[in-house]
């Protein structure tokens, strides 16, 4: 437990930052899930509106991930990994591999 005033304040600040980071990560994960679900919806029912939905969802997810790195919530390599997963899912949905 903290013994002096400055360390008590640091504990409070760390808890505040933890909660802010938690909500930011949660919002980021939600946008990623929306992107994955938009991809699966497009795979089942392709169309221009579904394709626009996929594009909009990946753009918003990428934006949130980049802002998380900028704010120090995520490490840049973790962000790159998440963006790579999203890109691969979108590519797979829009341009499926030819079956041979």
Swiss-Prot record:
Record-level GO BP terms: translation
Gene3D superfamilies registered for this protein in UniProt: Ribosomal protein S20
Annotated GO CC locations: cytosol; small ribosomal subunit
Example GO molecular function: small ribosomal subunit rRNA binding
Bilayer-crossing regions: none
Alphabetically ordered keywords of this record: Ribonucleoprotein, Ribosomal protein, RNA-binding, rRNA-binding
Chain intervals for the UniProt region annotation (Disordered): 79-100
A matching Pfam family: Ribosomal_S20p
SUPFAM superfamilies (UniProt xref): Ribosomal protein S20
Domain of life of the native organism: Bacteria
Similarity comment: family membership: Belongs to the bacterial ribosomal protein bS20 family.
Function (record text): Binds directly to 16S ribosomal RNA.
Protein name: Small ribosomal subunit protein bS20
Native organism taxonomy: Bacteria, Bacillati, Cyanobacteriota, Cyanophyceae, Synechococcales
Gene this protein is translated from: rpsT
């Amino acid at each position: 437990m903290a013994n002096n005033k400055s360390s008590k304040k640091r504990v409070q600040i760390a808890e505040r930052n933890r909660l802010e980071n938690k909500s930011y990560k949660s919002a980021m994960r939600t946008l990623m899930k929306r992107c994955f679900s938009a991809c699966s919806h497009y795979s089942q029912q392709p169309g221009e509106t579904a394709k626009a939905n996929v594009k909009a969802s990946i753009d918003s997810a990428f934006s949130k991930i980049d802002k998380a790195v900028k704010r120090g919530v995520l490490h840049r390599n973790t962000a790159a990994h998440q963006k790579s997963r999203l890109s691969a899912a979108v590519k797979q949905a829009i341009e499926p591999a030819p079956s041979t």
